Amino acid sequence: MLFKGLVLAISTFLCLIQAKEKQSNILIDELYQDKLWVLEKSTDDSLKIYSKKINGINLMAFRVNKTVTIDPLEIINVVSDLENYANFISNSKNLKTEKLDQNDGSLRAYQHIKISLPLFSDRDYFFKMIANKEALYNDKLIEWSLIDLERINEMDMSKKDENAIYLDYGAGMWLSRPVGEDKFDISYRLIMDPGG
């Protein structure tokens, strides 16, 4: 009887993990689709901001596009270089990023965001990033998704701030589409529950 109970508990746990992974894949697929994005703002320098309601989710997705002359591989190099975020993220003093491991074009990392406002708690999360053009398809450069706490091992869990609100629902991606000679439409797409 104890064995059957243990098997049932493990099976339930594995089903929950698979459901979270499936949910993450659905988010990535929805962000990738170009349908149903609503243009919210456009500027003269080609910046465009969009929003999108995703069915079954009580959150908005956001997308920013800009035409640039930056080599898309350079975007992969910069965004996946977690150790140097302080060199290109303007508010990096409020962001702590630590790479946990990396293999085959994907990495796992921990981020802590310090919120310097009264009555607001810091936020933190673990995430997985795939930054390998060969591992992704079509025009994707990078995709990332948040990792559920249940999937974090004990050693990595020691990095988590117990007082921060954990964010476990979110995903994003960088896309690049050629729009002319040495010009690319770069798109960053994001959906995340800010918690609290």
Predicted regions mapped to residue ranges:
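Sec-dependent signal peptide recognition
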Residues: M1-A9
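Hydrophobic h-region of N-terminal signal peptides that target proteins for export
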Residues: I10-A19
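Eukaryotic helix-grip
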Residues: K20-G196
